[in-house]
Amino acid sequence: KPMLKRKPSELSGGQQQRTAIARAIVKDSDLILLDEPLANLDYKLREELRDELPKLFAGRNAIVVYATTEPSEALLFGGNTATLHEGRVTQFGQTSAMYRRPRDIVTAEVFSDPPINTTKVEKNGKTLTLFGTITWPVGAAGAALADGAYTIGIRPHHITPAVQAKSSGSFQGRVLVTELSGSESVIHVDVGGKTWVSQSHGIHPFEVGAAATLHADVDQALFFGPNGELIS
């Protein structure tokens, strides 16, 4: 109420954002357009609205178009999602299905936060060779593929510190950055000149510059062909 009689120039960025969201919600419109509506809000309010907005729109007989750079927000809202890259729609479909089966490597990169880990691999029988010296078992995802060169993609939450490993596929890297949020650890490591990211529950205080042994869940890997298209 205190904001109702104020002009836009008299409101802060966060207040303008909250007012715009409220106006969109109270209107009985058939089409609601929201362009990064949570971007200028403080952390606490942003998290509250992330939970509340899907509930508010669920009971509305309206089409909601929600633009965001956050994959987590797209997954939270569900429905259908279109991913854009350089002004081009790379994929459109059910949100959860797109996350599990991105059409190509560009869509996988857009729809992953932290960024999906990718590198070239060589499949030979039941073995994958990556970074020239690291060998992994092929895993379920690549078992039916012909021998040859592919690009592999593994999401950060499928890479864990060795103490938590439950599947094969180990490698070592030099720790570049560690991010501790209290409930999870995000570890950036240099592997063969590329930066890979591990995201796991709990606190894992790796020292910057130290060696870290990580394990990848190879069964969850995505395999892409020479043109970047998803193969398996």
Segments from the language model and where they lie:
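Glycine-centered flexibility sites
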Residues: 13-14, 39, 87, 93, ...
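Non-catalytic connector elements of ABC transporters
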Residues: 116, 126-232
